Regions:
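Bacterial N-terminal signal peptides that target proteins for export
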Residues: 1-7
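Bacterial N-terminal signal peptides
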Residues: 7-16
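Cyclophilin-like peptidyl-prolyl cis-trans isomerases
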Residues: 15-194
Length: 194
């Protein structure tokens, strides 16, 4: 009886930590304040529910605050989403989300999670700087789009291209980026609009 009572008690402690991320509203907006100015993303949960829910969770937690735009390829994409703190990033690295079907094409201004294969999306995002329909067949599922400030996104520093090493960013965080790539633009804050 004591063992059973202990197991029930333990279950009450463990189950809340296994809870699913909060469901995002059907439509919501996120205001990004960056080193180059503001831009706003409008998210449509019905486009990609798993992606929208993860994005909502990460923005609410402040995950993207002080994140660098570490991959900026003109006429292709702007990518970010590795936390400034390697310990925080390590915690999220294994928290993948299931793929969403691609219901919207990767047109200029849409936002989607980066992926390295089936069901591998975690925290990294990109905004399409051009129409990239070839990404649709690769499983990149847009969940929202930039509704204001696309000119800000297009003006982010692109001089380093794809040079920053993502492994080093994950291991060293912003210390690596600030010392090796000081010109990178960054997110000051990302907030859900009321």
């Amino acid at each position: 009886v004591k063992t059973r009572a202990f197991l029930v008690f333990l279950a009450f402690l463990v189950l809340p930590s296994c809870s699913r991320a909060p469901q995002a509203p059907p439509i919501f907006r996120v205001q990004f304040t960056t080193s180059k100015g503001p831009f706003t993303v409008e998210v449509h949960r019905d486009w990609a529910p798993n992606g929208a829910d993860r994005f909502y969770e990460l923005v609410k937690s402040g995950f993207y605050d002080d994140a660098r735009f570490f991959r900026v390829v003109p006429n292709f994409v702007v990518q970010w989403g590795i936390n400034k703190d390697p310990v925080v990033q390590l915690n999220w690295r294994s928290k993948t989300i299931p793929d969403d079907p691609v219901t919207q094409t990767n047109r200029a201004g849409t936002i989607t999670f980066a992926t390295s294969g089936p069901n591998t999306r975690t925290t990294q995002l990109f905004i399409n700087l051009a129409n990239n329909p070839s990404l649709d067949a690769q499983g990149f599922a847009p969940f929202g789009e930039v509704i204001s400030g696309l000119n800000v996104v297009e003006s982010l520093y692109s001089g380093y291209g794809q040079t920053p090493d993502q492994g080093q960013i994950q291991m060293r965080g912003n210390e690596y980026l600030q010392s090796q790539f000081p010109m990178l633009d960054y997110i000051k804050t990302a907030k859900i609009e009321p």
